[in-house]
Amino acid sequence: MGYAATRTEERVAASLGLLASAPIEFCAGQDVAGGGVLLALPALLAMGLLAHGELYALPPGYYGLTSIFLLLALMALARIPSLEQLRYQASGEWGHLLGLDRIPEVRTLREKVQILCRQAGQAARWNTELAKQWITAEQAAEPVFYADGHVRVYHGKMTALPKHYVARQRLYQRATVDYWINAMDGQPFFYINQPVDHGLVAALREDLTPWLEANVAVSPEHQQRMDADPQVPRFTMIFDREGYSPELFEQLWERRIAVINYHRYPKEDWPAEEFHEETVELVRGVGVQLKLAERGRCAGWPREAGRSRW
């Protein structure tokens, strides 16, 4: 059975097909290597690590879906970069972290992961369900989402990806672009990967806002506000000047989606006398004093706001 395999009856039952999965049973221990990662376990569970497990399935065996998910999550926290590196870890010590006698052998773990990866489309469904759960937990009276793109450099040789400009290195390199939707405090909800990038405007029009429209529920109270006031948006999108497009803004507003964006082609500075000091409440309730000004524009009359330094 291997080193540290002490739950022999359950292992025999699993080998005979009589056990769906071994139950997780944490017990007291001293001087367990890597035990500090368990401090993050409540946070992982609160974020939904084991939620929506019905979307996946594993054949009966000693190591069930819960054990595999926990092991992969704790590996990330312990900075173990690959399954192969588990060969050099104490299997019994890691078993204590999972509430088992030992962790699976690397070959067994690979087989389990391959079974999960062969279930096409399940990862996207799981991601969608988790994102909806996080959005519901963070949703304010008027939902606001921050969209941003990040270039991810590709260092492999398997695919000849197109080149993108990498700002931090000031070079064009083979890369893909991830477009993230975040909460206002920076917590991520979901992302869409674009191997061939057509820009933030196209991503907003074709991918990000359609996903939000399909998966972000409108509360009854917010629906009442929208019915009573045609200027109340369904939700608001915030993004940088890469997404500046008056045509896109007009298309989004036709679907009751508001936009907060930097002007891509600013001209001369606005006169200082147009600015007035206002108190602005930040995400965590902290108030700051800003000097703000506002102008209207004739193209669909989006409001244009300016801010001076404070």
Regions found by a protein language model. Give the residues of each.
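Anionic group-transfer/hydrolysis microenvironments
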Residues: 150, 184, 242, 263-264
